[in-house]
A protein has these predicted regions:
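Electrostatic cytochrome c docking/interface patches
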Residues: 21-46, 57-68, 76, 222-230
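Conserved small/polar residues in nucleotide/adenosyl-binding loops
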Residues: 240
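Extracytoplasmic/secreted proteins, especially bacterial periplasmic and envelope-associated proteins
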Residues: 39, 43, 47, 118, ...
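Electron-transfer interface patches adjacent to heme c in soluble/periplasmic c-type cytochromes
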Residues: 71-143, 148-176, 189-207
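N-terminal signal peptide c-region/cleavage motif recognized by signal peptidases
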Residues: 15-17
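Bacterial N-terminal signal peptides that target proteins for export
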Residues: 1-10
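Short, aromatic-rich amphipathic segments at membrane interfaces
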Residues: 198-236
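The canonical Cys-X-X-Cys-His
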Residues: 48-59, 214
Length: 240
């Protein structure tokens, strides 16, 4: 009985992050994340602070929680804090909400729990889904969230893909493998983390890893206890 209980507990503990990651719905490519990979989480934290925190807050996440992913207080203060000198403060956006509404037409949402509400696969697909669309106010659109107000802040890393336009300057659509109408895209230029092969194929492995690290951190941020839970799960398995 005790052995069965341990096995059941371990299975539930290990399955919880996977179930959370699948909650986003939609036909998105699955992304494998490892909340125990501290190097990945640290890279993701750096990407988040340098790019996302300009406009988005993470008001339920305090800077000192980053110690949980292996960073020291000095590393946090010297590399990840730009708007406060108190390590116990929460992650607030650099941009004033009123300015954000004026420039983007809406206040960018808080990202603390976005991975839990939308799912890891959704976030990973969103980070890879930006494309140039001259019909949009910001000049950008997204395959995962059509008519998104957000510009592509990671375009320098990913490069630029653009929607094909018809004779009237309107986006060309096509059906995907699931029969859904999607924009017909083509790559225009590579970025710092992408390249074209000699045969013209677009290689984005490094950018995909970059997006995976950011997704991993956002998944951790939505549920910091998942690292401990997964460790407990493996310990329980080892004693069965």
């Amino acid at each position: 009985m005790k052995s069965t209980f341990k096995k059941t507990l371990a299975a539930l503990l290990l399955a919880a992050p996977i179930m959370a990651g699948a909650s986003g719905g939609g036909h998105y490519p699955h992304v494998e994340l490892d909340p125990r990979d501290q190097v990945s989480l640290q890279r993701g934290a750096q990407i988040f602070v340098n790019n996302c925190l300009s406009c988005h807050s993470a008001a339920a996440m305090r800077f000192n929680r980053l110690k949980d992913i292996g960073l020291t207080e000095d590393q946090i203060k010297n590399n990840l804090m730009f708007t406060t000198d108190k390590v116990g403060d929460v992650m607030q956006a650099h941009m004033n909400p009123a300015d954000a509404k004026k420039w983007f037409g809406t206040v960018p949402p808080d990202l603390t729990l976005i991975a839990r509400s939308r799912g890891n696969d959704y976030i990973y697909a969103y980070l890879r889904g930006f494309y140039k669309d001259p019909t949009r106010p910001t000049g950008w659109n997204n395959t995962v969230l059509p008519n998104a107000a957000m510009p592509h802040v990671l375009a320098a890393e990913q490069g630029i893909q653009a929607v094909k336009l018809d004779a009237k300057g309107q986006p060309v659509m096509k059906k995907d493998a699931h029969g859904k109408l999607v924009p017909d895209l083509q790559w225009e230029s590579a970025g710092k983390l992408t390249r074209f092969s000699k045969d013209g194929k677009f290689i984005e492995t490094d950018y995909n890893n970059y997006a995976r690290d950011l997704t991993n951190f956002m998944a951790y941020m939505a549920e910091p206890a998942q690292v401990q839970r997964k460790q407990i799960g493996y310990i329980a398995v080892s004693y069965t």
